[in-house]
């Protein structure tokens, strides 16, 4: 509230009003006890307007300083409920006894003592305020006599006006939490009456006319400026104190350089958990062969190897290629090291250089009784040097690929798993409709075994005659024995081994040497050679031929997902990308197509789009037009015959 004569109130309400204005934190026990006589005299003097507004303001400031000294002094907190009921009533204070302070109660003299005039002397302000107990501007003052903290030796000069804050004379920093923090000193200073300013000539007194007031000491620098609502317009803002240091933040400790935090240790422990321990036995995808050669030993020569494989020195113990090791040691894959006690099973032993029944047994001998010209022809024309084919390159046929791995590839790569008289299979027959992918599977087997691939066609062998065909056939088996491991792929097997009652002269002439080669080239003394025969007419083979092939698998037509995969690969080579709806419609319209027929469909669509280099991009309409020209060749009757023959003679998968 503003302390002006217009808003004067009874003096018995001053302590409560003063507490409301100055602070909201102190308890009622912090109130200063005023003598009843002095309070009545102040009430009388203020009610009869015997003192000016400035004198009343100065008196209030003086008592505020004394009040601050009481708040800053240590005291014994009284018990709760130690005040009488009269202390909560509006009127004179009814506390039973005065509260203790650092000094005895300040005696109040009569307000009229030392005041020669009243507030009516506006022009002679010097004589009217000669006995004012208020500190004048620029007055040096001595220290408090009872200052226990040891204040400064010299008092600072006070700036004119009332914009600065005041602290208690006996102020001393508290080391403990004995007292709550005192209210800001700026709040204890009431605003001056309206119209008052520090530069007004009415209250500009020379400093030499005032004597030093005893009992007052130098004050520390004033605190920061009070909030905006407590600053009176026209008063200068006090000099702010430096900002206090920010509190110490107690965050998480920072790890030293090179040290691992707790979180990283937890992550490391999680990585080495059960999931990491079983990573060693996880099923890895197929990997490309290493650059320094295939993982399966081969003859040491510099000639071209099938499927792009280089020669390896014989007898080198390495891991299997592809998903069976990929030519990369297991230690490089980051698996943890295990002791023998952690692995109760027994690992496959490494392949010996030349075990009995092993697949990779190089002979190193020049074939005898073989025409050198035929051998040169087979070496230059029949050795396949195409790119390697992985399992993922064969669309669909999941069950068939799994059966080939378990029953053919793994036994050949681990011959010690078949001890004694047991020998891994050396011949396999793949039958099914034309274009189903039988030759592609034969190339994939050569890639998985890391073997040289020699390709023969029955029609090519039967065309020049029986004698020439037999000579080429013997040269092919001799070349395969000289290049272990080797895969001899004979397609169109029905042209070489027709049924006995068909009466085909050429076929009958080649049947005897072929059966002899199968018995000799795949017998006990011809290790390292795998013969893969393919046919689209399995019913044309006689019983003797069926017995020569220990494994017989049916290669069916691709299903819908496999057809979609084949079409996507073929159309990507033509620069055509169909939408999902168009691709689904095309897959539905190619029911019964083989893989080869799907490739012919894409070629026909590209031919209808224009000349090579000038054609527009393929569209779905071009493929629809090509569907009218290309269709499936295998009939339902033929497909049923394949299924029946597989049930009777197939190995099953």
Swiss-Prot record:
It is found in: Cytoplasm, Cell cortex. Microtubule-severing enzyme that negatively regulates cell migration and wound healing. In migrating cells, targets dynamic microtubules (MTs) at the leading edge and severs them, thereby suppressing motility. Microtubule severing releases ARHGEF2 which activates RHOA, which in turn regulates focal ahesion turnover via focal adhesion kinase, as opposed to F-actin polymerization, to suppress cell motility. Negative regulator of axon regeneration that suppresses axonal growth by selectively severing dynamic MTs in the distal axon shaft and growth cone. Its EC number is 3.6.4.-. SMART domains: AAA. This is Fidgetin-like protein 2. Residues 119-129 have a biased composition (Gly residues). It comes from Homo sapiens (Human). GO terms for molecular function: ATP binding; ATP hydrolysis activity; microtubule severing ATPase activity. GO terms for biological process: microtubule severing; morphogenesis of a branching structure; negative regulation of axon regeneration; negative regulation of cell migration; negative regulation of wound healing, spreading of epidermal cells. Belongs to the AAA ATPase family. It catalyses: ATP + H2O = ADP + phosphate + H(+). Keywords: ATP-binding, Cytoplasm, Hydrolase, Nucleotide-binding.
């Amino acid at each position: 509230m503003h302390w002006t004569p217009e808003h004067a109130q009874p003096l018995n309400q001053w302590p409560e009003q003063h507490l409301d204005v100055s602070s909201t934190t102190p308890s009622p026990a912090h109130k200063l006890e005023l003598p009843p006589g002095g309070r009545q005299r102040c009430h009388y003097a203020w009610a009869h307007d015997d003192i000016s507004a400035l004198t009343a303001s100065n008196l209030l400031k003086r008592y505020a300083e004394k009040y601050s000294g009481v708040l800053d002094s240590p005291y014994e907190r009284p018990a709760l409920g130690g005040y009488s009921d009269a202390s909560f009533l509006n009127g004179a204070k009814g506390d039973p006894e005065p509260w203790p302070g650092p000094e005895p109660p300040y005696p109040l003299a009569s307000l009229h003592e030392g005041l020669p005039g009243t507030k009516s002397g506006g022009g002679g302000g010097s004589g009217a305020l000669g006995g004012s107990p208020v500190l004048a501007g620029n007055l040096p003052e001595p220290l408090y006599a009872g200052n226990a903290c040891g204040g400064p030796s010299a008092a600072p000069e006070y700036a004119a006006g009332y914009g600065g804050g005041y602290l208690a004379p006996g102020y001393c920093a508290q080391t403990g939490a004995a007292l709550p923090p005192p209210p800001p000193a700026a709040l204890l200073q009431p605003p001056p009456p309206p119209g008052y300013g520090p530069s007004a000539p009415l209250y500009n007194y020379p400093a030499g006319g005032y004597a030093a007031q005893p009992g007052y000491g130098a004050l520390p620098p004033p605190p920061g400026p009070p909030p905006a609502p407590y600053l009176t317009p026209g008063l200068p803002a006090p000099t702010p104190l430096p900002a206090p240091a920010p509190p110490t933040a107690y965050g998480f400790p920072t790890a030293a350089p090179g040290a691992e935090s707790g979180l990283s240790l937890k992550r490391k422990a999680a990585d080495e958990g059960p999931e990491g321990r079983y990573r060693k036995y996880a099923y890895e995808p197929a990997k490309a062969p290493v650059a320094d050669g295939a993982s399966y030993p081969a003859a040491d020569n510099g000639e071209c190897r099938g499927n792009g494989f280089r020669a390896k020195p014989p007898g080198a113990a390495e891991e299997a290629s592809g998903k069976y090791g990929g030519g990369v040691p297991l230690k490089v894959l980051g698996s943890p090291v295990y002791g023998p006690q952690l692995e109760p099973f027994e690992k496959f032993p490494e392949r010996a250089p030349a075990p009995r029944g092993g697949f990779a047994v190089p002979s190193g001998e020049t074939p005898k009784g073989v025409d050198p010209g035929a051998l040169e022809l087979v070496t230059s024309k029949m050795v396949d040097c195409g790119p390697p084919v992985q399992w993922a390159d064969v669309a669909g046929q999941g069950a068939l690929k799994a059966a080939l791995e378990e029953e053919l590839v793994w036994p050949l790569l681990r011959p010690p798993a078949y001890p004694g008289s047991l020998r891994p299979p050396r011949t396999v027959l793949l039958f099914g409709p034309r274009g189903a992918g039988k030759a592609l599977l034969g190339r994939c087997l050569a890639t998985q075994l890391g073997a040289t691939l020699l390709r023969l066609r029955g029609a090519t062998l039967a065309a020049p005659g029986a004698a020439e065909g037999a000579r080429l056939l013997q040269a092919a088996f001799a070349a395969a024995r000289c290049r272990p491991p080797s895969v001899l792929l004979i397609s169109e097997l029905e042209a070489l081994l027709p049924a006995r009652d068909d009466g085909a002269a050429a076929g009958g002439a080649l049947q005897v040497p072929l059966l002899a080669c199968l018995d000799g080239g795949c017998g006990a003394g011809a290790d390292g050679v795998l013969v893969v025969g393919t046919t689209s007419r399995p019913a044309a083979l006689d019983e003797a031929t069926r017995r020569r092939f220990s494994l017989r698998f049916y290669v069916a037509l691709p299903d819908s997902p496999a057809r979609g995969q084949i079409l996507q690969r073929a159309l990507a080579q033509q620069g055509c990308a169909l939408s999902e709806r168009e691709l689904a419609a095309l897959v539905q319209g190619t029911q019964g197509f083989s893989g080869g027929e799907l490739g012919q469909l894409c070629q026909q669509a590209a031919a209808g789009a224009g000349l090579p280099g000038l054609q527009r991009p393929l569209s779905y309409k071009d493929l629809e037009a090509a569907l009218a020209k290309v269709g499936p060749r295998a009939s339902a009757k033929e497909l049923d015959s394949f299924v029946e023959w597989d049930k009777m003679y197939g190995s099953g998968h």
